[in-house]
Amino acid sequence: MEVDKNLAENFYKKDLVKIVYLLDELNKDKYTKHILRFLANENIELGSEVLAAKLATDISRFDFAIQVSKIASYQKRFHNKYNYPIISTPKYINKRKIPEAAFILSIIRQESEFDTSANSSAGARGLMQLMTYTAKTVAKQANMTYSKSRLTKDPEYNINLGSHYIAGLILEYDGAYPVSYTHLTL
């Protein structure tokens, strides 16, 4: 959806938008998701959902952009640019070829919706929802230092470990992605 330039300019002048940026700077995003949802619903027909999702992306909260976009998709309004974020993924880790970015990103979206601080009730952590035991094992295999705190604080670290693990499964199952995916217990 193309958003009117004047609407976009007025959107970014709003106090709530300034508050979202301030909360991001202060690393205090407890209320950010609620503010973004409010902003998304202000004027849907003119593009408030797109602007709210873009704002979430601007502050690197892809998880919030996905949530806004998902809600819109239930009403047949599709904002795929924000519903399926694209971030950098490795090509090789310790000489192991990593699957293409689209595969890694689809796993991240399914597992955590791009929430870097995600913690599951089972104990899985970060973007790729790595279990601590798996992360320790993979870190050793990849010649990386294991750090439990980095699983939720360092997205690149989490993606590197998870990608290395997935690449190993694909090798183990002779390149069969579907079989590898069904054996995925990050």
Residue positions per predicted region:
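Conserved small/polar residues in nucleotide/adenosyl-binding loops
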Residues: T182-L186
